[in-house]
Design a protein with these regions (language model features):
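Charged, amphipathic alpha-helical segments
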Residues: 19-22, 40, 77-84
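Beta-strand secondary-structure signal
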Residues: 34-38, 96-98
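Generic marker of residues within folded, mature protein domains
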Residues: 8, 27-29, 51, 87-89, ...
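Tryptophan-paired
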Residues: 50-101
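Extracytoplasmic electrostatic interaction patches
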Residues: 86-149
Length: 149
């Protein structure tokens, strides 16, 4: 009798473990990365928001393809003063943006993103480029440091 209960328990556990889960999104979801930019003086390396050269209210991020404004977040916590764009990569898309601050054209940002679907969705970035400005990428923090003269 004990062997029957043991066999039945093992069989039920096995069947439960092999249950087909058709909802792959519950297994994992990898959101696209946020793109962060620090605007610094090319000579001194000072953050141009921290030193008062630029003001957050004067930032304009524009989609070049249709001239529409693009939402961004300004991270001022602990004097980081970073521009963060978090809307790229939730779908397959090509994004071409320009960033102006205080009426000055600062840089262009281009992304070719492909959203890969499946049990573990993720974004494949085919191309990421910054033009019209010198920059450095901090690979540890993933912050693009835009060098402004």
């Amino acid at each position: 009798m004990k062997k029957t209960y043991l066999l039945l328990t093992v069989l039920i556990a096995f069947i439960q473990g092999c249950k087909d889960n058709n909802d792959c999104n519950e297994l994992c979801f990898t959101p696209p990365e946020n793109f962060q930019f620090e605007i610094v003086d090319k000579t001194s390396g000072e953050n141009l928001f921290t030193n008062g050269t630029y003001n957050v209210q004067d930032i304009i991020v524009t989609n070049v393809m249709d001239n529409s404004p693009v939402e961004f977040t300004f991270i001022s916590e602990n004097d980081m003063n970073l521009i963060q764009i978090g809307s790229i990569g939730f779908k397959t898309e090509i994004v071409n943006l320009k960033v102006d601050i205080s009426g000055n054209y600062i840089f262009s940002f281009y992304v070719d993103a492909e959203r890969k679907e499946g049990c573990c969705s993720y974004t494949l970035y085919k191309e990421i480029s910054i033009s019209e400005a010198e920059f450095e990428l901090d690979k540890q923090s993933e912050v693009y440091k835009i060098l402004v003269e």
